[in-house]
Design a protein with these regions (language model features):
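A short beta-strand element within beta-rich, extracytoplasmic domains
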Residues: 52-64, 111
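Trp- and acidic/polar-enriched beta-sheet ligand-binding modules for extracellular glycan
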Residues: 3, 13, 36-41, 64-132
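Extended extracellular/luminal ectodomain segments enriched in beta-structured repeat modules
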Residues: 40, 49-56, 106-107
Length: 132
């Protein structure tokens, strides 16, 4: 994921060294991004190399802290339009794969979690992968 710049809505207790966004992309199965409480939460990936064509993505949540009412949004530098596709993750610990009906092209990709399975609105992600 070195070809993307990542921003997130929040980090638990602002503890970037423990729960920062970079931990979604490392190979360590014990590290994660953990949001602060409150809804909505989001993860934004911005391509460093211009437009990208995305066909699918994978997310591994921590059970009990998964997204609900989720949307994958795509913005292009060539258009003001935002493509928004809902996706429906299960509240489990395993890596979940989501294929798009039609591949989308853009330079900014946003995973929006309108609500969470956690009562306080927290999201915990161990792994996030976008596939071209």
């Amino acid at each position: 994921m070195e070809n993307f710049k990542c921003r997130v809505s929040s980090v638990q207790n602002r503890a970037l060294k423990m729960y920062g966004s970079r931990f979604m992309f490392d190979v360590n199965e014990e590290t994660c991004w953990s949001s602060d409480q409150g809804s909505p939460q989001w993860v934004e990936l911005q391509s460093k190399d211009g437009e990208r064509k995305i066909s699918s993505f994978s997310i591994q949540f921590q059970g009990g802290f998964a997204g609900k009412d989720c949307f994958f949004e795509v913005k292009s530098s060539n258009s003001l339009d935002i493509i928004s596709t809902p996706f429906y993750p299960d509240d489990v610990n395993t890596l979940q794969h989501f294929s798009l009906q039609t591949p989308v092209t853009g330079n900014t990709f946003i995973f929006k979690f309108t609500t969470s399975t956690d009562f306080f609105g927290r999201i915990v992600i161990y792994k996030l992968v976008v596939n071209e």
